[in-house]
Design a protein with these regions (language model features):
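Condensing-enzyme catalytic core mediating Claisen C-C bond formation in acyl metabolism
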Residues: 1-18, 26-27, 188-266, 272-273
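Active-site pocket-shaping loop/turn-to-helix segments
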Residues: 42-62, 109-118, 136-150, 197-210, ...
Length: 380
């Protein structure tokens, strides 16, 4: 609810972080601390094996499980799968190097070090904590990872290989270490992120965690527990650019969106909202705007929230699914509060708060390496 209220108010969650003193830009998301005291909840080994942003993940997962009325007994006795989008553990890796240099002896490292420095640290730790018996997997696909994690979950459920999938997006918070190399590309905004704006000059990284729980609409558990379905995952599409590692390709982004629409059994005219990737970079936003304009002769509402949330990178796709569900729940669209002027007149960018009850929201998450993901969240 707090997230919904802040987004509807157009409240910007970015700040200048003094810890990032060597960066070209110190603008990043302001992420509060995790809610629970996990020292009293987890075993000592579980606590030590978890990377720092894993505690944000635990907050998100436990809240999602509670809302979906998923019990500990259900997790232990059913074929539940876990898919995590995560692509770095920089803080823990930097800490590892610091200790080895200081001690000149890797035998002094705690045995837990290995398990919080792997990209798969979140999924392997959660699989143990939650007693997962289905697939446990980490997807590393840069900023498209969250969308691909959702798509893979859909494939698992459609093929009836699992009863439920817990999908998580996890992103190290914008601390001293985790975004140094990204910042070196010169794509971070020094002052204000303007998705699709004429004055856009870059993105601002953010982090934390998001979680959604997917299960078939005919699930017996949903009926027995009287669990309301918030929304339906109706389609997934993907593509790859096959070009330079940092260069967006509007045609392949178009392919990704069209695949998702086809997979959902819809036509273009039935999409009434596009929740755009739109990070605020000059090239990236232009490519996505061109792709959207090419697909839709009459442009649907385009929502771009990263001027408020920052770009949550590895968790972005999953947080978009949460945002789409919020818009269904409240019947109101988020607006590009920080964008001063729309650079693309044909793009129906939502610039002011708008009451609107959507039926199908197309979400985009694109990443380095030219990996593109699109998925559709539909009203139930």
């Amino acid at each position: 609810r707090e997230v919904a209220l802040n987004l509807y108010k157009g409240k910007c969650g970015l700040h200048h972080n003094e810890d990032r003193w060597a960066y070209i830009s110190d603008l990043c998301g302001k992420v509060p601390s995790w809610k629970e005291d996990y020292l009293s909840i987890l075993t000592h080994a579980q606590y030590k094996c978890m990377p720092a942003h894993g505690f944000f993940v635990l907050d998100a997962v436990f809240e999602a499980l509670k809302k979906a009325k998923v019990s500990k007994e259900f997790l232990e006795n059913h074929n539940v799968s876990l898919i995590v989008s995560n692509d770095s553990e920089c803080y823990e890796s930097a800490d590892l190097v610091k200790h080895v240099k200081s001690d000149a002896d890797n035998r002094q490292l705690p045995v837990t070090t290995l398990f919080n420095t792997l990209n798969s640290a979140i999924s392997m730790n959660l699989a143990s904590i939650l007693h997962i018996h289905g697939l446990s997997l980490t997807v590393s696909a840069a900023c498209a990872g969250g969308g691909h994690a959702i798509g893979l979950a859909k494939m698992l459920l459609d093929s009836k290989q699992t009863e439920m999938v817990i999908v998580i997006g996890a992103q190290e918070c914008a601390s001293r270490y985790c975004m140094e190399a990204f910042d070196a590309l010169g794509v971070f905004s020094p002052d204000n992120v303007q998705p699709f704006g004429k004055g856009r000059n870059g993105l601002a990284p953010s982090g934390g965690a998001a979680c959604i729980i997917l299960e078939p609409s005919d699930s017996l558990r949903l009926k027995e527990e009287k669990v309301p379905s918030f929304a339906s995952l109706s389609g997934y599409g993907f593509s790859s650019n096959g070009k330079a590692i940092t260069t967006p390709d509007s045609y392949q982004e178009e392919v990704s969106m069209l695949k998702a629409i086809e997979n959902a059994g819809l036509d273009e005219g039935m999409i009434d909202v596009v929740l755009a990737h739109a990070t605020g970079t000059p090239m990236g936003d232009e490519a996505e705007a061109k792709a959207i304009e090419s697909i839709f002769p009459i442009c649907p509402n385009v929502v771009a929230t990263k001027g408020m949330t920052g770009h949550e990178c590895w968790m972005a796709g999953v947080s978009q699914a949460v945002q789409a569900t919020i818009m269904f729940t409240y019947g109101r669209l988020f607006h590009a509060a920080t964008t001063e002027e729309n650079a693309f007149p044909k793009l129906n960018l939502v610039m002011r708060p708008k009451w609107y009850s959507p039926h199908h929201i197309l979400c985009n998450a694109f990443g380095f390496g030219g990996t593109n993901s699109s998925f559709i969240i539909s009203k139930v």
